[in-house]
Amino acid sequence: MDVIERFCKIYTDICQISPAELESIYANDILFIDPITTHRGINEVKDYFANLLTQAQSCQFDIANIFTCSYNSSQSQSDVSHVVNWTMTLVLKNNAKVITLDGTTQLGVNNDRIIYHKDYYDLGEMVYEHVPILGFIIKKIKGKLAK
């Protein structure tokens, strides 16, 4: 099983991830970026997931498709070798509301380890729209813009 297959398997249910599994897919010098923050190195990524696990009741990814990009073997850390499209279903422990979010991840792979991981998703859809008053306002604005 190559690193992309292991990545997809692990991300099926993030709440079941162990630090050893993270080490099996991410390089020691991983650069992990999402719309909220940036993590450098496997220890920061493990801390990020440990924090996520304290807050999430469940977090599952449905991988829609994976695209392989052409790249050369002397790639830099930010060179993208794969693009993964997914739908995340998240339930937080303090709020049983289900959050469903579509997103894309760019991955860079070298020596069967992921050295670059960058997530793209609508942060408003993930966070702001679930704050009662703010969510109402954002949904109203989106509705007016869609007309």
Regions found by a protein language model. Give the residues of each.
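Basic/polar N-terminal segments that are highly enriched at the extreme N-terminus
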Residues: 1-2, 147
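Generic recognition of short, well-ordered alpha-helical interface segments
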Residues: 2-5, 40-44, 136
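A short, structure-level motif marking secondary-structure boundaries and short turns
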Residues: 3-4, 34, 89
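Short acidic-aromatic low-complexity motifs
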Residues: 4-25
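A beta-strand edge to alpha-helix "cap/lid" segment located at domain peripheries
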Residues: 55-60, 68-147
